Amino acid sequence: MSDMYHQLPPEIWVKIMDHLKEVSLLLTNKDFFGLFNLIDVEKNMIEHIVENGYLDVLKYIDSLKNQNKFIVDKEKFSVKSLDKYLIMSCEFGHLEMTKYFVSQGANVKTDNNMPLRLASQNGHIDTIKYLIENSVDVRANNDCALRMASLFGHINVVKYLVDMGADVTSDNNFAIIHTARSGRLELAKYLAEKGADIRASNDSAVIRASERDI
């Protein structure tokens, strides 16, 4: 990629970037990164980096900041909130980035345990295990993690959370009711085996299942 950079003068690359409206190329190596001095990028690059899991790039930017380099002393490289970026890394399942933010001081329980909720909702089992191993309460917010994992059909996550102490009957058997509504027979059977009440809320789960011919 560095060889490609040197095939064209910087001003041509700037025009290409302006035309493509794609900033990821600027993150491929130090040569392209230097074009940030010449290109007006409106988006916050830290958010873009976190969404895509570019941990090495994030560490490189942090090293430049520690050296007080002008190129990263701009709004597009500003860190709005470590906790916010931790939440994002958990949402997208970037485990190593999650660990990095925690090492920098981010709170794994931030925003009412939002990291665990979003990791469970999106089925990122390794991130979930890391959070729980680092003192996040598996039963936080009335077993929100279990309810979200059930709602979105992540059976491996549900099983892990139950093994760690989550209650399948929380919120008036929310998990099995919504699992039945979604037609996820295997997960519904598992929840019932673990004590969820199939007849809760006036047989809501049974009705939902019958509507789908389960």
UniProtKB/Swiss-Prot annotation:
It comes from the Viruses. Keywords: ANK repeat, Repeat. It holds the Pfam family Ank_2. ANK repeats lie at residues 41-70, 81-110, 111-140, 142-170, 172-200. SUPFAM superfamilies: Ankyrin repeat. This is Putative ankyrin repeat protein R844. It comes from Acanthamoeba polyphaga mimivirus (APMV).
